[in-house]
Amino acid sequence: LAIPPFNYPVNLAVSKLAPALMAGNTVVLKPPSQGVVAGIHMIKCFQAAGLPAGTVNLVTGKGSEIGDFLTTHPAVNCISFTGGDTGIAISRKAGMVPLQMELGGKDACIVCSDADLDLAATHIIKGGFSYSGQRCTAVKVVLVMQDIADELVRKVHAGVQKLKVGRPEDNADITAVVSEGSANFIQGLVEDAKAKGATFLTDWKREGNLLWPVLLDNVTADMRIAWEEPFGP
């Protein structure tokens, strides 16, 4: 059973399918609810390429409705899942079935005193805000030596201010997050940080699912944003 995420619905699906097929298995692909069309077209490509019928099988639907049925089905003898907290629920219900999971994280960038700060700032911005931050490997926190912190903050802030916010078809750097639920979750993290005294280097702005990039300083360990994965800009 292969369950890829919405942000790379083809790339991460293939990375699950290929090893399984090479090892002689048949596979059930359950594409993400927000990436079903990509999964359907990929299966059509496999069929057009001559892959035997039944080798890769597609099941669509909301994970909340069909997830338990799939992950606990007796015919499933391995589960490969990429995502967030859902992986915990799958692992609890799957029993002794082998699991391969890539879940959430809080990826840090560490900047030492002798670093090239222009280079560091460039990669922090690229790592934090590409795909509007909707990547499991996105930079989510920067740990920097005190003696260079203020200068690095200025450089990162200047770069963030240049990011274009808007629609993908307009080549914007920051586009809408995947769902209203995701936007609401991110807003909750931001509001918690504000209530607990974080320094906002950018203004908080939201229009529907479109969130302007947020840059925070003086984040403390009691803030949710210090520990939870925002999966957004």
From Swiss-Prot:
The gene is GapN. It is found in: Cytoplasm. The record marks 7 as: Transition state stabilizer. It is an enzyme of class 1 (oxidoreductase). Keywords: Cytoplasm, NADP, Oxidoreductase. Algae contain three forms of GAPDH: two cytosolic forms which participate in glycolysis and one chloroplastic form which participates in photosynthesis. These three forms are encoded by distinct genes. Important as a means of generating NADPH for biosynthetic reactions. One of its GO terms (cellular component) is cytoplasm. Induction: Induced by sugar addition. Its EC number is 1.2.1.9. Belongs to the aldehyde dehydrogenase family. NAD(+) binds at residues 83-87. InterPro entries: Ald_DH/histidinol_DH, Ald_DH_C, Ald_DH_CS_CYS, Ald_DH_CS_GLU, Ald_DH_N, Aldehyde_DH_dom, ALDH-related_metabolic_enz. It catalyses: D-glyceraldehyde 3-phosphate + NADP(+) + H2O = (2R)-3-phosphoglycerate + NADPH + 2 H(+). The lineage of its organism: Eukaryota, Viridiplantae, Chlorophyta, core chlorophytes, Chlorophyceae. Substrate binds at residues 7-8, 135-137. The keyword NADP applies. This is NADP-dependent glyceraldehyde-3-phosphate dehydrogenase. It comes from the Eukaryota. NADP(+) binds at residues 30, 33, 180, 229. It comes from Scenedesmus vacuolatus. SUPFAM superfamilies: ALDH-like. One of its GO terms (molecular function) is lactaldehyde dehydrogenase (NAD+) activity. PROSITE patterns: ALDEHYDE_DEHYDR_CYS, ALDEHYDE_DEHYDR_GLU.
